[in-house]
């Protein structure tokens, strides 16, 4: 009997040992699984960070390349016979106005594809190599350069003394009417920028904004980035989309480049003008070499035109780069100012006034996204 009990105890202890081993094995397996899962997640996270960094570096290189192109296309010595025009900001044509006038309206480059072939008489050296080399493996890649002086500068609504500029206010109201928007928006935006707190329209100053659920005040300063007007009363996302191609915010006051301005803007600045006819004439003749040439044109004869508001060159350019690489997207935009060299025999430089990342929800507001969509059709 004693022997049977001893044998039973041995079997019982062996069973406990087996269960303990199985329990330990299960715990080790669970720990290993957890470690492998965590390691796999860390690898994926690291890969995502690397891909994101690669995508952003492609975008940054695109911005730098865009600045190189701006300087090359706006050199005084560039062949003046190579002028090409853009009828409207949204026309998606390839190149802007007269090189001899240092005016660049629009240039769009798609990665991994040959750059545009030079037209007759154009110096081929304006392109840095025949291909954009860094984005050949990108799913989508684009660089967009825009002449910001071909748009209405919102900061022109206010004079240097901080008072509302009535003449520019009327110009902006005519632009709004042409776009079928409420002209009162011009009053609200002007009140947002002017330095005082005296309303020029109903509920256009601090008192109205302080009644909002999230209270805030008017800026009472020049606009740095045009999308700031989303905070202005009456300005919605839809309004922003309509204004996108026609307004900008650059240090003011600034002049409008007649060689890159749209027909809407020109008609607003010269009441009674046939903007489409002027653009056709401008394109056919390779742009205007001087403002006086425009003022002496038969298209402006008998019309009230303030020549001091116009120019035939530009200093401010917005450069946007967009890249989608291996499923990751990135888009950045910079505003560059072309500054002439103070010393002789020195080339002009581009100064970056601001640099900002475009969030994905805002990409739909940029022409960059519209160009990408057009390329995919």
Predicted regions and their residues:
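Compositionally biased linear targeting/interaction segments
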Residues: 16-377
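N-terminal leader/signal peptides at the extreme start of proteins
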Residues: 1-14
